[in-house]
Amino acid sequence: MCIRDRLTTILTYSIAIPLGITAGRHQDEWQDTSVQIFNYITLATPGFVFYILGLWLFGFTLGWFPISGSVSANASGFWGVFGSRIYHMILPAILYALITTTSTVQYLRTGIVDNKVEDYVRTARSKGVPENVVFHKHILRNSLLPIAAFLGNTITGLLSGSMIIESVFS
């Protein structure tokens, strides 16, 4: 697994876990609706279209990221080349992470919503345990277990989806 795939995995979970927690904790409120709209848009948009739009917006229009290559021509020395490689990896990694967050967000949201009504949560609330403790110790802990198991599926998806990313950003 290359560095970009590792960066993408870290970004995927860094984006997906807070979004899933927000959507699950605020079920049927505006936060949940916003996360669901984001999920549906990223799920319905084909990857190559999403990548080309991101490349056009952040590469051509705004000029924040390079549009091709893997190292700048004027990079010299180890740290210059290393920094240039990271700079060239950021846009593909972010765009791919945004696409791959959808399933993780949905799994986590569904787990939180399902665990909210379990007997052990109801028992903890009836004992007078503060809601924040109930959420972190009972609901969130049990909802994150499927996400940890889903990591293997995410890694295999990254390896297969790298071909599309490489063809768009080459």
Model regions and ranges:
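Membrane-water interface segments at transmembrane-helix boundaries in multipass membrane proteins
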Residues: Q36-T45, V49-T101
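Alpha-helical transmembrane segments of integral membrane proteins
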Residues: R4-Q31, G47, W79-S170
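Hydrophobic beta-strand positions within the nucleotide-binding domains of ABC ATPases
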Residues: M1-C2, I41
